[in-house]
C-alpha cells in the first residue's frame, strides 16, 4: 500500500532526476505501474534550477491517496551550491505546491555552521502527512548529532534504519 507508494515514488524520482529531456514521458510499464513525467522548465524561482512533476499510479495504492502530493528535494549543499536566497526560494516553492508530504534526500549542507539554518528552512514547509529525511554522505560528517537534534526540533522524521507508514483518509 503506502510503502509501495513511497518506494515507487522515491525510486521514480531518483531514476528520473537524472533525465535531461524536456519532453513528456509515459512509462512502458502496464497501467497499474504507471509513472508519467513532465519537466517544468521554468519554476518562476530564479535559484531553483529544476522542478519536475510526476503522476504515479499503482494497483496497490489505496484510493485514499488519490491526489496525494509528495515533494522530494536533495543535494542542496547549502552555502556552496545554494545560498540564502535560493533556500528561501525553495521553501516558498515547496509551500506553494501544497504538498501532503516532503521527502528529503540528504546532502543538505556544506559546513556544520549551516545545519540549523537549512533544517529550520525545510522545517517550515507545511506538510499534513509529515516531512521525512534520509542523510547523505555530507550529513554523516562532523555534525551528525547536530543534524539529528535539529531535525527532531523541527519535527522532521529521520528514516535511519527504519520505515514509516503514511496514513491518509483512512488509507495506509
Walk through the language-model features, giving the residues of each:
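Short acidic-hydrophobic surface loop/beta-edge motif
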Residues: 54-58, 162-169
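Conserved beta-strand termini and adjacent loop/short-helix elements that scaffold enzyme active sites
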Residues: 59, 134, 159-161
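Alpha/beta-hydrolase fold active-site loops
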Residues: 68, 171-172
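Membrane-embedded segments
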Residues: 47-49, 64-149, 153-157
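Acidic, histidine-bearing metal-coordination/catalytic regions of metal-dependent phosphoesterases
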Residues: 1-69, 80
Amino acid at each position: 500500500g503506502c510503502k509501495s507508494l513511497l518506494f515507487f515514488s522515491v525510486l521514480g524520482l531518483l531514476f528520473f532526476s537524472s533525465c535531461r529531456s524536456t519532453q513528456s514521458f509515459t512509462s512502458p510499464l502496464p497501467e497499474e505501474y504507471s509513472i508519467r513525467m513532465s519537466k517544468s522548465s521554468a519554476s518562476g524561482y530564479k535559484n531553483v534550477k529544476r522542478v519536475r512533476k510526476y503522476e504515479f499510479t499503482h494497483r496497490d495504492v489505496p484510493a485514499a491517496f488519490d491526489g496525494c502530493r509528495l515533494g522530494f528535494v536533495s543535494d542542496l549543499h547549502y552555502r556552496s551550491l545554494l545560498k540564502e536566497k535560493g533556500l528561501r526560494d525553495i521553501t516558498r516553492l515547496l509551500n506553494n505546491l501544497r504538498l501532503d508530504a516532503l521527502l528529503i534526500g540528504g546532502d543538505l549542507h556544506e559546513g556544520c555552521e549551516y545545519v540549523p539554518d537549512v533544517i529550520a528552512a525545510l522545517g517550515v514547509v507545511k506538510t499534513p502527512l509529515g516531512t521525512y529525511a534520509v542523510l547523505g554522505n555530507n550529513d554523516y560528517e562532523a555534525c551528525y548529532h547536530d543534524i539529528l537534534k535539529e531535525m527532531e526540533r523541527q519535527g522532521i522524521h529521520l528514516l535511519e534504519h527504519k520505515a514509516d507508514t503514511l496514513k491518509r483518509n483512512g488509507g495506509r
